[in-house]
């Protein structure tokens, strides 16, 4: 580059999910090493997702060591927690999701405001068939295809360990390692970034679907303060958390005054 060259780059290393296609997250992370006098502006306000979703996703991505440090804040407040459902099997998960979709539609949510995400298309086949049978046109995408998209309500299915889950078994794929030299830790971090991308597609409500006894290890990285867990498919899910109406801080049920802003708590 010459002295008069002007270079402008935009990117988010936290959403780098195409390493299997040859992309390299180091282009963003090490940008300042290659261009020492670069001026870096970090966009740290999330206008899409609620506070609980943003804080949960921040915690998940914090487990990655190789990243640009950022502190992302949410512009939206909400009482709704992230729902984690652990079914006994895939049929349990299907029943739970169908039941929740019916409830959401009754609440006034539109079909195109609900998005189902998954790693591989075949995971969604039973859901597609069920929704088609009930004449429900619900949006669905693979997580990679959903990058850049958003929806009021997001369901992420297939959050289990092993093949096709999170993290996926392809991390140990010998053919992949022949094509491209693979570092296990860095590939694991890309898997976590994929999970981060999935979580942050949700604007208002997020449902994480797993199987009892085979939960994705990434689910354990979300603090329980942001989630409500259930394993009964047709049981109403209490997914709200008490917050101060003035400062939006999380509160305990028995508090009568917000300890942060001294606002009186009313039911």
What are these regions (language model features)?
Residues 10, 43-45, 53, 81-92, ...:
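Conserved RecA-like ASCE P-loop NTPase motor core of nucleic-acid helicases/translocases
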Residues 110, 125, 135-137, 145-212, ...:
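Conserved helicase C-terminal RecA-like lobe
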Residues 24-27, 49-52, 56-61, 90-93, ...:
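Helical mechanochemical/support elements of P-loop NTPase systems and associated helical scaffolds
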Residues 176-186, 197, 204, 210-267:
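Helicase C-terminal subdomain and adjacent C-terminal extension
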Residues 71-73, 142-145:
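Short, solvent-exposed loop/turn elements at beta->coil junctions and helix N-caps
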Residues 1-83, 168-169:
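Conserved RecA-like helicase ATPase core segment
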Residues 13-17, 22-26, 46-51, 90-91, ...:
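Conserved nucleotide-binding/hydrolysis micro-motifs of P-loop NTPases
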Residues 2, 36, 109, 203, ...:
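Short conserved AdoMet
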């Amino acid at each position: 580059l010459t002295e008069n060259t002007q270079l402008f780059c935009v990117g988010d290393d936290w959403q780098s999910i195409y390493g299997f296609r040859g992309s390299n997250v180091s282009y963003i992370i090490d940008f300042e090493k290659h261009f020492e006098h670069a001026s870096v502006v970090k966009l740290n306000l999330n206008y899409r997702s609620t506070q609980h979703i943003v804080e949960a996703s921040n915690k998940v991505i914090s487990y990655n060591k190789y990243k640009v440090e950022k502190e992302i804040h949410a512009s939206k407040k909400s009482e709704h927690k992230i729902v984690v459902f652990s079914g006994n099997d895939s049929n349990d998960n299907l029943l739970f999701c169908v039941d929740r979709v019916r409830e959401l539609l009754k609440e006034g949510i539109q079909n195109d405001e609900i998005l189902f995400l998954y790693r591989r298309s075949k995971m969604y086949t039973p859901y597609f068939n069920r929704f088609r049978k009930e004449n429900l046109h619900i949006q669905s995408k693979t997580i990679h295809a959903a990058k850049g998209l958003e929806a009021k309500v997001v369901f992420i299915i297939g959050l289990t360990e092993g093949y096709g889950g999170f993290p996926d078994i392809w991390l140990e794929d010998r053919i992949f390692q022949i094509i491209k030299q693979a570092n296990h830790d860095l590939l694991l971090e890309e898997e976590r970034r994929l999970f981060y991308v999935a979580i942050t597609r949700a604007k208002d409500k997020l449902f994480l679907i797993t199987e009892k006894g085979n939960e994705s290890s990434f689910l354990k990285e979300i603090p329980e303060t942001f989630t409500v867990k259930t394993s009964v498919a047709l049981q109403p899910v209490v997914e709200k958390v008490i917050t101060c109406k003035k400062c939006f801080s999380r509160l305990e049920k028995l508090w009568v005054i917000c300890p942060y802003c001294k606002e009186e708590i009313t039911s």
